[in-house]
Amino acid sequence: MLRFLSKNSVAAIRNVSIARGVHTKATLPPLPYAYNALEPALSETIMKLHHDKHHQTYVNNLNAAQEKLADPNLDLEGEVALQAAIKFNGGGHINHSLFWKILAPQKEGGGKPVTSGSLHKAITSKWGSLEDFQKEMNAALASIQGSGWAWLIVDKDGSLRITTTANQDTIVKSKPIIGIDAWEHAYYPQYENRKAEYFKAIWNVINWKEAESRYSNR
């Protein structure tokens, strides 16, 4: 996304975008499993709401903002006003697109660590055990005030760490390995105010094969 630039810079970048056909529209990725495949950890109802409604809204709003950004008559003030919408909705699209991949039905390995993998070894080396790592991730999730995400990321030096982001901010300069949604829409229709139960249950459907692949291909 564009930063705060001079009027001439904004115009130049927009002209390039227009010449290239503006932006490719974002699309809602299909879930790689059935809506009820993550039960009982995540109900069919909540998965339909989360994917079909919330994620779709991020996609729709991102596309709308991108279209407005391509308007050759847009002034600098209009450009700046659109940045927040692009950051928020683009972040929601990016974060959720990863989230669906990092989950898997139990019959397809969800919740089962790849104990022979390099990620598992790195986690146990740093946190002592997978259980201790999960406790720290859950503590990070619980510490989020309002809405946000907790992440296991790998930095450029290869080290793992846990971090959080607010709202739909994305991970930059590091690679996200596991991301867990702490927004109320991710759990409230099923768990209501018992979000600690959601934080515990979601580990039963974490796609460790995907996490291992992301770590190995960092």
UniProtKB/Swiss-Prot annotation:
Residues with the Phosphoserine modification: 129
GO cellular component: mitochondrial matrix; mitochondrion
Metal-binding among keywords: yes
Transit peptide as recorded in UniProt: 1-21
Binding-site positions, Mn(2+): 50, 96, 181, 185
Matching Pfam families: Sod_Fe_C, Sod_Fe_N
Domain of life according to the entry: Eukaryota
Gene Ontology biological-process annotations: removal of superoxide radicals
UniProt EC number: 1.15.1.1
Subunit organization: Homodimer.
Family note: Belongs to the iron/manganese superoxide dismutase family.
Protein name: Superoxide dismutase [Mn], mitochondrial
Gene name of this polypeptide: sod2
